[in-house]
Amino acid sequence: TYGIHDALIIVAGDCGFGFESPDYYEDIYLTILRHLQAYNLCIVMLRGNHDNPAYFNGDKRITHERWQTVADYTILQACSHNILCIGGAISIDRTRRLQRMVLHPEQEGYWTDEAPIYDSEALDALKEQCVLIDTVVTHTAPSFCELQTKRGLTSWCMHDSALWSDTTQERQTMDDIHAHLLRD
């Protein structure tokens, strides 16, 4: 446990939910439950691009008291902070993952609804409810955060003609979320 106790641990995506059966994740939970209880830990996970969104925004959500997945735009309250959680990102390796699914159709490996979503209505509702967000946890980031260049992306774009524009749109989505939060 690295000396961590009495803590909320937020995992900012890429947990791997969807690559294995639901029983696999339940077994992990049962394996770590004793430690979560003994050290008073709660693990909350938001979706990354290497996660099936159904585990976060759909019918496969994990809702254990000390181990759970959260939907986009969930507000966590901890240590006097209001923490906004927004998952999703574009997979730069999606063509390779799609090719693997052709060879192994019984295995999930890519989800088309992976991108982050700018939900202005959800953000407006926070303002209407007088919820002041002081912490934001996301899987990807606005354009002013690292990585600020797309160096290294060009080799992936050789195999995915839409990747450059999709990652540009991803950053714009995150910029829009950031601007909205600053405005409120």
What do the PLM-derived regions correspond to, one by one?
Residues 67-68, 107, 183:
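A broad structural signal for short, well-ordered beta-strand segments within beta-sheet-rich domains
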Residues 33-34, 59-60, 73-74, 119, ...:
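Short, flexible, glycine/charge-rich loop motifs used to bind or transfer phosphoryl groups or to couple energy/partner
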Residues 28-40, 165, 169-181:
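Catalytic-core regions built around general acid/base machinery
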Residues 79, 182-184:
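Secondary-structure boundary elements
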Residues 81-173:
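Active-site-proximal loop/helix segment associated with metal-binding centers of metalloenzymes
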